[in-house]
């Protein structure tokens, strides 16, 4: 009942904000209406420079009504819901993910990087950046060369995000790729290779945690998670975050 209008005493009044970056499985492609909406008045999202009540789709990088891949349910809503319930604190989501993007498009100085920095700095006028959530890598899996160069690029990207956003210990939470992605996408063995790289990076990037996607179902398109799986994935992201900060 926490999110249904019941008054609670916050442990703290600070808004905790989280930057959402990556490609479509961070933005969210789950079908709207397949899962109950999350209604929690302590969860917010950045819209037009202001905190608005959280409502999906949170990261509308694509059309909501038209096209093959529509914006929809993602992992961030259940992440925010779990955070607010655990810590009795308001949460703000900063949606900056963009479907189909490669990590090269996120490098420091790129449009996507600069947009994420700008939106986060705007958000942190009225919040504290408490973490960066990243889900990306499918776009690299068509190329052995891109997979081989991924680790260095992500390591540098995390450093750049942190240096621009004022803290080298901002938690960085990232997720595996599904190894059930349909063969029609042409990713082959590189998905498993990428997950191996992620595992190594989780040991190399300080204050980071890797999230398993084992057992999560995919939509008929063979690459995006189902709405129910996004809900579970958001909980897994939160649990990874919670374990990480409990060690600090």
Question: What does each model-found stretch correspond to?
Answer:
Residues 1-248:
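Cell-envelope and extracellular/periplasmic
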């Amino acid at each position: 009942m926490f999110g249904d209008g019941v008054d609670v005493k916050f442990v703290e009044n600070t808004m905790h904000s989280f930057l959402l970056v990556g490609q479509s499985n961070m933005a969210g492609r789950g079908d709207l209406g397949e899962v109950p909406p999350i209604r929690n008045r302590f969860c917010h999202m950045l819209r037009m420079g202001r905190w608005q009540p959280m409502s999906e789709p949170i990261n509308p990088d694509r059309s909501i009504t038209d096209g093959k891949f529509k914006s929809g349910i993602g992992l961030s809503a259940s992440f925010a819901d779990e955070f607010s319930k655990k810590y009795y604190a308001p949460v703000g989501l900063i949606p900056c993910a963009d479907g189909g993007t490669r990590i090269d498009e996120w490098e420091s100085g790129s449009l996507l990087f600069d947009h994420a920095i700008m939106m986060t700095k705007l958000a942190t006028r009225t919040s504290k950046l408490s973490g960066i959530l990243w889900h990306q890598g499918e776009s690299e899996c068509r190329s052995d060369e891109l997979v081989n160069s991924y680790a260095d690029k992500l390591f540098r990207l995390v450093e750049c995000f942190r240096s621009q956003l004022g803290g080298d210990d901002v938690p960085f939470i990232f997720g595996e790729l599904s190894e059930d992605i349909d063969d029609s996408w042409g990713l082959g063995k590189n998905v498993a290779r990428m997950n191996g790289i992620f595992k190594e990076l989780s040991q190399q990037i300080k204050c980071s945690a890797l999230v398993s996607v084992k057992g999560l179902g995919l939509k008929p398109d063979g690459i995006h998670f189902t709405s129910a799986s996004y809900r579970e994935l958001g909980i897994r992201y939160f649990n990874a975050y919670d374990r990480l900060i409990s060690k600090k």
